[in-house]
């Protein structure tokens, strides 16, 4: 079992399989050239697999595959199948922008993936183009429908931005509700790679907009996880991830492995442990040691709710958000 200095059990790893992305979203990497990462040094997926087997043996019960855009990584379905075969009790989920999802959904489902989280920031084509610098809405929606068709569980993630997509909060909720998908609204998390003009809506502002149409009956906070779950009068549930107001760090159960082999204890802080050599050598003893050290290094909490704190400098496309 992996336990940090604050007695939190760490049983969830987010694994970035690439920094590359086919989008250039305003809140993540808007100014990065599309070919910027052509020469990136990636950990071979077989080596990542061995690392994750060790992590599973140490008590990890959930693995999320991220990027960049993870569906750009070749051989991903085979990697997931091998991971699933090693321990079928481990939940395997994936975060994607959905652009390549339609053609890959069936293979991902057959490989053993249990759920997909799709970023959907707008239902308007021109707005998606403005946000992501990609004419991507049609592909994303088709990917969502195909995932439902093949039986993949789904969640939608929406980063809510002032004067960008805040007028679509209800429309996006209706879209998700009609498909029995949970949508999670995410407060914009300031970082030095985002456009400086991007401003997010806070949790209470999002709730006020939803309350204009729906009666919110209650809220529950899962013991683990970063989102609060709200229930509407009709029984539909949606989530809000609010790092500026919610101290979800007290129940944090995760660490992150970047595509270059660094283990990141926290999304906010720059600190990381370089495990590349151990992973490349499949050095079980050292991997265990570095894994445990990264857990011990986890800070008590992030600082997004501190107005005097510095803006995080490590890119979300590096750690996988």
Curated annotation (Swiss-Prot):
Pathway(s) served: Cofactor biosynthesis; molybdopterin biosynthesis
PROSITE patterns: MOAA_NIFB_PQQE, RADICAL_SAM
Functional description taken from the UniProt entry: Catalyzes the cyclization of GTP to (8S)-3',8-cyclo-7,8-dihydroguanosine 5'-triphosphate.
Cofactor: [4Fe-4S] cluster
Binding annotation for S-adenosyl-L-methionine: 27, 68, 119, 189
The protein's name: GTP 3',8-cyclase
HAMAP family for this protein: MoaA_B
Enzyme's top EC category: lyase
Binding site for [4Fe-4S] cluster 2: 249, 252, 266
CDD domains reported for this sequence: Radical_SAM (cd01335), Twitch_MoaA (cd21117)
Species this chain originates from: Helicobacter pylori (strain P12)
Family: Belongs to the radical SAM superfamily. MoaA family.
Record text on subunit structure and interactions: Monomer and homodimer.
Keyword terms: 4Fe-4S, GTP-binding, Iron, Iron-sulfur, Lyase, Metal-binding, Molybdenum cofactor biosynthesis, Nucleotide-binding, S-adenosyl-L-methionine
Residues annotated as binding [4Fe-4S] cluster 1: 21, 25, 28
Assigned EC number: 4.1.99.22
Residues where GTP binds: 14, 64, 95, 155, 254-256
Record's cofactor remark: Binds 2 [4Fe-4S] clusters. Binds 1 [4Fe-4S] cluster coordinated with 3 cysteines and an exchangeable S-adenosyl-L-methionine and 1 [4Fe-4S] cluster coordinated with 3 cysteines and the GTP-derived substrate.
Known catalytic reactions: GTP + AH2 + S-adenosyl-L-methionine = (8S)-3',8-cyclo-7,8-dihydroguanosine 5'-triphosphate + 5'-deoxyadenosine + L-methionine + A + H(+)
GO molecular function terms listed in the Swiss-Prot or TrEMBL record: 4 iron, 4 sulfur cluster binding; cyclic pyranopterin monophosphate synthase activity; GTP 3',8'-cyclase activity; GTP binding; metal ion binding; S-adenosyl-L-methionine binding
Domain Radical SAM core: start-end pairs: 5-233
Pfam families with a match to the protein in the record: Fer4_12, Mob_synth_C, Radical_SAM
Any one Gene Ontology BP term: Mo-molybdopterin cofactor biosynthetic process
Organism superkingdom: Bacteria
UniProt xrefs under InterPro entries: Aldolase_TIM (IPR013785), Elp3/MiaA/NifB-like_rSAM (IPR006638), MoaA (IPR013483), MoaA_NifB_PqqE_Fe-S-bd_CS (IPR000385), MoaA_twitch (IPR010505), MoCo_biosynth_MoaA/MoaC (IPR050105), rSAM (IPR007197)
